[in-house]
Amino acid sequence: MSRVRPTKFAHVVYRTRRFKEMLRWYEAVFGAEVQYQNPVLAFLTYDDEHHRFAFANLSLIQPDGTEADRHGVIGVDHVAYTYASLRDLSDNYAYLKEKGITPYWCAHHGITVSMYYADPDGNQMEFQVDSYRSNEDANAFMYGPHFSANPIGVEYDPEDWLARLRGGTPEADLLLRQIHEPVSPVRGSLEE
């Protein structure tokens, strides 16, 4: 298996207890616009990408948390990198697995299919592929009821998807999230 590299930096996710203040700051500094917002999550962009920044409101996620809590620490939650195709993302999964590196969470967010990893220091990163061919379609999905009903996504089994892709299943059959699938719990640093 050969190494597969991401094609671009995608976004950064911040954990904050100053949710509204952070949104105003990023709107002012970057000219960012809110793509989607609910009381717990917000997604902003400053270009044609579906989102460049995401914010998790710790005041609601961990209302009793302190700065010393592992799950309630403000700051960077993860950085994300985009791969050219679902096949590349899955091949990279197989390559890393051969080296003993496996994701702690695989989620189909609707706008992206993602695998989350943690480095030896616990820094989290998301490797993703866009589910839509155009940013316009991804943005339309974010404004729609399907995303509003489930902005976290659904978990999937990377082994199953790898086997399906290698067995000839078209990427398009896996990229569009089905509305009936259950909402995934949040994994990683915000997990209880």
Predicted regions and their residues:
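Short, P/G- and charge-enriched loop/turn segments at secondary-structure junctions
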Residues: 1, 66-67, 103
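A detector for short, charged/polar N-terminal pre-domain segments
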Residues: 1-2, 164
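N-terminal "first-domain core" detector
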Residues: 5-47
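Vicinal oxygen chelate
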Residues: 7, 15-21, 73-74, 79-124, ...
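Histidine-centered active-site/metal-ligand motif
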Residues: 11, 50-53, 63, 78, ...
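Short N-terminal helix-initiation segments at or just after the protein's N-terminus
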Residues: 15-27, 56-67, 162-163
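Conserved short beta-strand elements that form part of the metal-binding/catalytic scaffold
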Residues: 33-73, 118, 124-132
